[in-house]
C-alpha cells in the first residue's frame, strides 16, 4: 500500500469519475485505474462500483467503511510534513538548555530573552546544575546545549570556549580585606572561607589555586549554592571566591580582584559529540557567542569595590 494510492482513492471518491479524477491528479486514466485495482487486490476488497463505460463510480460498502481511514492517513501525512516544516523553520519545537547557577542570571537569561523574542514558538526548558552533572545530562540527551566551565574531559561532549570569567574575593564591607584594591591567593592562607558544595566548579577552581600557591584557607562553611554563599559572606561568616558576574548589582558586598595573572575560569558551550546540534540550539549558541562582543558578560572585576 502506497500513500499515493490512497490519494488516488480519495480523488476518485470525491470526483465519482475516473477520468475527472485522473485529470485532477495529472495522470493518464488507465494508470489511475491500474493503481486502484492494485490497491483493491492488496486489500482484498472492491472499493468502487464500476458501471459500464466512463460513467459515475460509487464507493462500495467496503469503500465507504475504509474512506474515513484514508482521510485520516492522508491528513496525518500532511500534518507530519507541516510539523517538520515548522520545526526546521523554528516555528515550533522544544529546546533544553543547561547552565551553572552563576551563568544563568548574567549570561543565559539575556540570551534566552532575545531568543524567545525571535522564536516565540520554541518552548524553552532551563536546567540548573554544576558542569559535571550537565555533562551527564548532555550525554543522556536530557539537555541539548549547556554552558559549562572547562576543563571537560568526557569524550562524548564537544566544547567551544566562549570567554574567560574573572573570579573575585567577595567580602562584607567591614571585612579586614575590604579596603584592599587587590588580593593575592596567598592572602587566603588561614582566611575563613565560605566554600561551595562538592562537585561545584568554583570549589574545584578555588581549592586548586590554593594548592598551587601552597596555602590552606580555613573552611568555615561548605555545601552552599551561590545565593547561600553570598548570604553567608554578607552575614560576616567569611569570604568567598566567586565569579565577578555572580555579584548582584545591588549587592553591598565588596568584590576584590586578584593580583595578576588573577584567577579566572573558562566558560564554554557544550553539546553532545555524536549528534548534530538542533537548529534551534545552533541559533541560541550563536547568540551566546555574540554576548562577548556586545560586552554583556561581566563588568571589569575591579569596578566592584
Model-derived features: where do they sit?
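A short LG(V/I)-centered, amphipathic sequence patch enriched
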Residues: 40-59
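Short loop->beta-strand "edge-of-pocket" segments that line small-molecule binding or catalytic clefts
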Residues: 96-98, 167-168, 176, 183-202, ...
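Hydrophobic hinge/microswitch elements
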Residues: 130-143, 148-149, 197-256
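Beta-alpha-beta core module
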Residues: 155-161, 165, 180, 187, ...
